[in-house]
Amino acid sequence: MRDMMSMMKKAKEIQEKMQQIQEEMTNLQMIGTAGGGLINVTLNGKNTITAIKIDPSLLKPEESEILEDLIMAAHNDAKTKIEIAMEEKTKSMTAGLPLPSGFKFPFS
Protein backbone atom coordinates (compact mmCIF):
# COMPACT_ATOMS: atom_id res chain seq x y z
CA MET A 1 0.00 0.00 0.00
CA ARG A 2 2.84 2.40 0.83
CA ASP A 3 4.48 1.64 -2.50
CA MET A 4 1.27 2.56 -4.29
CA MET A 5 1.00 5.84 -2.37
CA SER A 6 4.64 6.60 -3.11
CA MET A 7 4.11 5.89 -6.82
CA MET A 8 1.05 8.14 -6.92
CA LYS A 9 2.98 10.93 -5.19
CA LYS A 10 5.84 10.59 -7.69
CA ALA A 11 3.39 10.57 -10.62
CA LYS A 12 1.87 13.81 -9.34
CA GLU A 13 5.35 15.34 -8.99
CA ILE A 14 6.18 14.36 -12.56
CA GLN A 15 2.91 15.82 -13.83
CA GLU A 16 3.54 19.11 -12.02
CA LYS A 17 7.10 19.30 -13.35
CA MET A 18 5.88 18.59 -16.90
CA GLN A 19 3.36 21.42 -16.67
CA GLN A 20 6.01 23.81 -15.34
CA ILE A 21 8.45 22.85 -18.12
CA GLN A 22 5.80 23.34 -20.79
CA GLU A 23 4.96 26.81 -19.47
CA GLU A 24 8.62 27.82 -19.39
CA MET A 25 9.27 26.45 -22.87
CA THR A 26 6.42 28.51 -24.31
CA ASN A 27 8.30 31.67 -23.33
CA LEU A 28 11.63 30.45 -24.71
CA GLN A 29 13.03 32.26 -27.76
CA MET A 30 16.01 31.15 -29.86
CA ILE A 31 17.64 32.82 -32.85
CA GLY A 32 19.03 30.69 -35.64
CA THR A 33 21.53 32.21 -38.04
CA ALA A 34 22.82 31.37 -41.50
CA GLY A 35 25.10 32.91 -44.06
CA GLY A 36 27.39 34.36 -41.44
CA GLY A 37 24.55 36.33 -39.88
CA LEU A 38 22.92 37.47 -43.13
CA ILE A 39 19.74 35.63 -42.10
CA ASN A 40 18.29 35.41 -38.58
CA VAL A 41 15.18 33.39 -37.74
CA THR A 42 13.63 33.60 -34.26
CA LEU A 43 11.53 30.70 -32.96
CA ASN A 44 9.56 30.40 -29.75
CA GLY A 45 9.33 27.27 -27.63
CA LYS A 46 6.46 25.97 -29.74
CA ASN A 47 8.66 26.12 -32.87
CA THR A 48 6.68 29.03 -34.28
CA ILE A 49 8.65 31.61 -36.24
CA THR A 50 8.30 34.96 -34.48
CA ALA A 51 10.76 37.00 -36.57
CA ILE A 52 12.91 36.84 -39.69
CA LYS A 53 15.72 39.32 -40.39
CA ILE A 54 17.27 39.39 -43.87
CA ASP A 55 20.32 41.40 -44.83
CA PRO A 56 19.33 43.73 -47.70
CA SER A 57 22.25 42.47 -49.80
CA LEU A 58 20.31 39.23 -50.33
CA LEU A 59 17.20 40.93 -51.68
CA LYS A 60 18.12 40.62 -55.34
CA PRO A 61 16.23 38.41 -57.81
CA GLU A 62 19.41 36.53 -58.70
CA GLU A 63 19.95 35.72 -55.01
CA SER A 64 16.50 34.17 -54.42
CA GLU A 65 17.69 30.55 -54.34
CA ILE A 66 20.48 31.38 -51.90
CA LEU A 67 18.00 33.33 -49.78
CA GLU A 68 15.61 30.37 -49.64
CA ASP A 69 18.41 28.01 -48.58
CA LEU A 70 19.66 30.40 -45.91
CA ILE A 71 16.19 30.88 -44.43
CA MET A 72 15.76 27.11 -44.12
CA ALA A 73 19.23 26.77 -42.58
CA ALA A 74 18.55 29.53 -40.05
CA HIS A 75 15.19 27.98 -39.15
CA ASN A 76 16.81 24.58 -38.61
CA ASP A 77 19.54 26.19 -36.49
CA ALA A 78 16.96 27.85 -34.23
CA LYS A 79 14.92 24.64 -34.02
CA THR A 80 17.98 22.67 -32.92
CA LYS A 81 18.73 25.29 -30.24
CA ILE A 82 15.13 25.06 -28.95
CA GLU A 83 15.32 21.25 -28.80
CA ILE A 84 18.62 21.36 -26.90
CA ALA A 85 17.25 23.94 -24.44
CA MET A 86 14.12 21.86 -23.86
CA GLU A 87 16.16 18.73 -23.25
CA GLU A 88 18.47 20.51 -20.79
CA LYS A 89 15.55 22.11 -18.94
CA THR A 90 13.71 18.80 -18.72
CA LYS A 91 16.80 17.05 -17.35
CA SER A 92 17.39 19.71 -14.72
CA MET A 93 13.77 19.81 -13.57
CA THR A 94 13.27 16.06 -13.44
CA ALA A 95 16.57 15.26 -11.73
CA GLY A 96 15.89 12.90 -8.88
CA LEU A 97 12.54 11.69 -10.19
CA PRO A 98 12.37 7.95 -10.87
CA LEU A 99 11.90 8.01 -14.66
CA PRO A 100 12.62 5.03 -16.90
CA SER A 101 15.80 5.18 -18.96
CA GLY A 102 15.21 6.96 -22.27
CA PHE A 103 11.92 8.50 -21.13
CA LYS A 104 10.99 11.57 -23.17
CA PHE A 105 8.35 14.19 -22.47
CA PRO A 106 6.00 15.21 -25.32
CA PHE A 107 6.49 18.96 -25.82
CA SER A 108 5.83 19.62 -29.49
From Swiss-Prot:
GO terms for molecular function: DNA binding. Its main location: cytoplasm. It is found in: Cytoplasm, Nucleoid. Keywords: Cytoplasm, DNA-binding. It comes from the Bacteria. InterPro entries: YbaB-like_sf, YbaB/EbfC. Homodimer. Belongs to the YbaB/EbfC family. Binds to DNA and alters its conformation. May be involved in regulation of gene expression, nucleoid organization and DNA protection. This is Nucleoid-associated protein BQ02190. It comes from Bartonella quintana (strain Toulouse) (Rochalimaea quintana).
